[in-house]
Amino acid sequence: ALPISYSLGGDLTFERYAFKAGWASAWKKIKIGAEARFRAEHEYRTTDPRPRNIVTDLTLLFGASAPLLASHELGLTGGLRFYKQTNNVAFLREAGVIPEYHMLGLGMDYKRFSGNNASAYYKATGCEVGIDLVPTGKSGLMFSTQYAYTPYHRILPNLNALPISVLGVQTLKGEVGWRQGQRDGWLLKAAVCHERRTGNEQIAGSSSSTE
């Protein structure tokens, strides 16, 4: 998500905790599985300006696979992503504060809410799907594609939880290759990744010729 920016810099300290767990089972020729990934991150600085960013990121994936013809196995996956981030900036020095800027990307900021709006939070619920085709024997064609979409909503809590922008991130990945042998074999593959970002800003409040 796009940050709150200011004119003074400095190093940041961060703590990150992550875990991943999975489960798999089989019923006749059908295989099923699930996976959970969680990340928590805390980023801060002890000198002015003092940002404090807290992130929680949870991804849940479910999948199933079954034989396709006699030489391959087809797998389908789907999942959800739950993202939340809080962002606060504090000033403790006697000299006062400096303006904060809510960035919109491409070097632009939201002038209507820049200045003393030093708090924001972001939330998103995304989804992803995937298809995999793998050979069941020692050799064969391999194919994989994944699509994910996550809209990040930026909200100002000090203005009655006013949503001011949405950042939509779409990701498309694909791989195709050939596997020859297993223990002493080789694998040749080509991969491509495409990401598209779209922004949507909300116009709120009364108009002003200076904004």
Give names to the regions the model predicted.
Residues 49-57, 91-100, 159-165, 204-210:
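Flexible, surface-exposed loop regions and adjacent strand-edge segments
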Residues 10, 41-55, 118-122:
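Outer-membrane beta-barrel proteins
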Residues 19-25, 60-66, 80, 129-135, ...:
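Residues on the lipid-exposed face of transmembrane beta-strands in outer-membrane beta-barrel proteins
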Residues 13-19, 52-58, 123-129, 149, ...:
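Residues that define the transmembrane beta-barrel architecture of outer-membrane proteins
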Residues 28-34, 70-76, 127, 137-143, ...:
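Outer-envelope beta-barrel architecture signal
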Residues 155-159, 164-168, 174-211:
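Long, charge-rich C-terminal accessory regions
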Residues 27-29, 38-42, 80-84, 147-153, ...:
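Transmembrane beta-strands of outer-membrane beta-barrel pores
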